[in-house]
């Protein structure tokens, strides 16, 4: 499993904080950030890498998280969540089988961002009654 991470200019500093944290937690990271990328481009790059392997997860950071979330939800088969708290990050994996989260550097601080990332990457899909919803999401295009 790889954690694919990317950021636009507004999210660069926080991306490095999250990236360093996850690397210290022994996760394999793939950073697709390129200089001057808009949130649309970076979200598409993260999604492309996430979709290479079923177990891959993605994190996109910009100023507010809303833009990358909107882009991610346009990608067929991508279940994404915009999060700004640890519980939502964990639960979106458990109940929605989300493969990508977005967050805003102007909304969350360093410690909260690390905890959000930790909750997301450590979350496990519960399946069962949640699968009906996940199937519905995956059929949307």
UniProtKB/Swiss-Prot annotation:
SUPFAM superfamilies: Ribose/Galactose isomerase RpiB/AlsB. One of its GO terms (biological process) is galactose catabolic process. InterPro entries: LacA, RpiB_LacA_LacB, RpiB_LacA_LacB_sf. Keywords: Isomerase, Lactose metabolism. It catalyses: aldehydo-D-galactose 6-phosphate = keto-D-tagatose 6-phosphate. The keyword Isomerase applies. Pathway: Carbohydrate metabolism; D-galactose 6-phosphate degradation; D-tagatose 6-phosphate from D-galactose 6-phosphate: step 1/1. It comes from the Bacteria. GO terms for molecular function: galactose-6-phosphate isomerase activity; ribose-5-phosphate isomerase activity. Belongs to the LacAB/RpiB family. PANTHER family: GALACTOSE-6-PHOSPHATE ISOMERASE SUBUNIT LACA, RIBOSE-5-PHOSPHATE ISOMERASE B. Heteromultimeric protein consisting of LacA and LacB. This is Galactose-6-phosphate isomerase subunit LacA.
